[in-house]
Amino acid sequence: MEDSEEHHFSSVEEETRYWKELAMKYKQCAENIQEELCEFQEGSREYEAELETQLQQTESRNRDLLSENNRLRIELESVKEKFEMQHSEWYRQVSALEDDLAQTKAIKDQLQKYIRELEQANDDLERAKRAAIMSLEDFEQRLNQAIERNAFLESELDEKENLLESVQRLKDEARDLRQELAVQQKQEKPKTPMRTSLETERTDTAVQASLSLPSTPSLHRAPNINIPTPATFRRGFEDSYCATPLTPAARISALNIMGDLLRKVGALESKLASCRNFVYDQSPDRTTVSMYMNRDALETRMSPHQPLCDTGLVKRLEFGTRPSSTPGPMSHPSQSVVKMLL
């Protein structure tokens, strides 16, 4: 309309031609559009079919994915449950292991403390062992000393028994001599007058001087050793044997003393005959000497410190056998003989 209004045709034919050309143009355009529409519809149908196939595929795939998703969700739930169970189990195990670790640490501390105590106790036991070893060695040393002392004492006891036998033999001889003297005193009568007071005093002085023997070295004594001796021994003789083991020098000295005493006893026995001549041939002298000898012997028996050998010698002088019939010697040699015997 606008074109018609804008265009001013000069004739009707021109206007008809114009409108024919315009109709042909629009018709050609409509045909083109119709062709395009057909092509579009055909492409749309193809595309729709393709989309439907894709939709079906997508739906089937979606269904598969949903089923897979459900399956995976179920598996996830089961895995979660398993994980929870394993987590709780692991937590319990970790808690138990922590408790065990704490207990192990406590036990380790206790064991370390116990080890220290054992080491201290071991040190104490080692010290006690060393002390026991030292005390045992000391005890063994003392035991060996005691064994040696006992062996020495046994030898001394053997010597003492021998001396006791000798003393008993001398006592038996003295008893026999005493009995013989008693018989002789009953049978004999006085043959010479009594001594004067001066001679008696001189004889007393000689006998008293003869009783004091030269001192000999005493035996080595040590305390705390007691040996039982018979009741017949004097205290001095007991003290000489009641001692600890003697040193070699003291033992030799003691043996020398005993040997000297035994030699003196033998010498006294050999010289007894010469004394008997004076004692029994001169009756007044015999009576006086016997009186003083009896008194000295009694004092010797009463004295606790007088050695046993002196008592035996006095008894041998006091009780003698009957002398042989020989001429009587003078008074002065007899006094020297008494001194030698004593």
UniProtKB/Swiss-Prot annotation:
Ranges of Polar residues composition bias in the record: 322-342
Chief place of localization: cytoplasm
Recorded coiled-coil stretches: 45-189
Cross-referenced Pfam families: NUDE_C
Keywords of the record: Cell cycle, Cell division, Centromere, Chromosome, Coiled coil, Cytoplasm, Cytoplasmic vesicle, Cytoskeleton, Kinetochore, Membrane, Microtubule, Mitosis, Phosphoprotein
Interaction with PAFAH1B1 as annotated region, ranges: 89-157
Region (Disordered): 182-203, 320-342
Gene Ontology terms: cellular component: centrosome; cleavage furrow; cytoplasmic vesicle membrane; kinesin complex; kinetochore; microtubule; spindle pole centrosome
Record PTM text: Phosphorylated in mitosis.
Subcellular location: Cytoplasm, Cytoskeleton; Cytoplasm, Cytoskeleton, Microtubule organizing center, Centrosome; Cytoplasm, Cytoskeleton, Spindle; Chromosome, Centromere, Kinetochore
InterPro entries: NUDE, NUDE_dom
Function: Required for centrosome duplication and formation and function of the mitotic spindle.
Family according to the record: Belongs to the nudE family.
Name of the featured protein: Nuclear distribution protein nudE homolog 1
Natural source organism: Gallus gallus (Chicken)
Gene this protein is translated from: NDE1
